[in-house]
A protein has these predicted regions:
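Conserved catalytic cores and adjacent C-terminal regulatory segments
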Residues: 1-171
Length: 171
């Protein structure tokens, strides 16, 4: 289920706390919430889904009216360095570089496709804010909080602020 507050949506009146609990119920890390799990399992980067909902014909909106500022959680380019040509099903699960490569490839590929298609659809009306990290950080690594805080403080927001000023102030 994609939660949104679009008029007449079945989720229009859902409470924010319920949406937050459901959308953060990442399998393995957190329990399901009212039979829902983290939407990142289906749409790691929900940009494309948000565009599709925004151009719903019942809303009478045009794609030209959409401005999308997409916030990432930071990325670390981590490719599979091994030769995978002889891998079987087990190798895609148990290999350690990266951990669980089939999941890593699936989630990262899903996010990249969403970003590529979103940019293709919206062109300059799409901006992705997603700082590059110099190391891989697992979702539950509390020891990385200081590093992430420092990364956020040092991140150059000039281009993003310029995009916001250019795109939002013209609407």
């Amino acid at each position: 289920m994609f939660y949104n507050n679009i008029p007449n949506s079945p989720t229009e009146d859902f409470r924010v706390v319920d949406v937050a609990m459901a959308s953060s119920a990442a399998p393995v890390f957190f329990p399901t919430y009212e039979r829902n799990i983290d939407g990142g399992i289906i749409a790691t980067d929900p940009s494309l889904a948000s565009i599709v909902y925004s151009i719903d014909k019942t809303l009478g909106k045009s794609i030209e009216n959409i401005r999308l500022l997409s916030f990432g959680t930071g990325y670390y380019y981590n490719s599979i360095k091994q030769d995978t040509s002889n891998w079987g099903a087990i190798d895609w699960v148990v290999s350690k570089d990266p951990d669980l490569p089939i999941i890593s490839v699936t989630l990262e590929g899903n996010a990249q496709v969403s970003q590529i298609f979103s940019k293709k659809l919206l062109q300059d009306n799409y901006y992705r804010l997603n700082p590059r990290m110099n190391r891989d950080i697992s979702m539950d690594d509390v020891k990385a909080i200081d590093y992430l805080t420092q990364l956020a403080k040092e991140y150059d927001m000039t281009e993003c602020v310029s995009w916001i000023n250019d795109k939002w102030n013209k609407i």
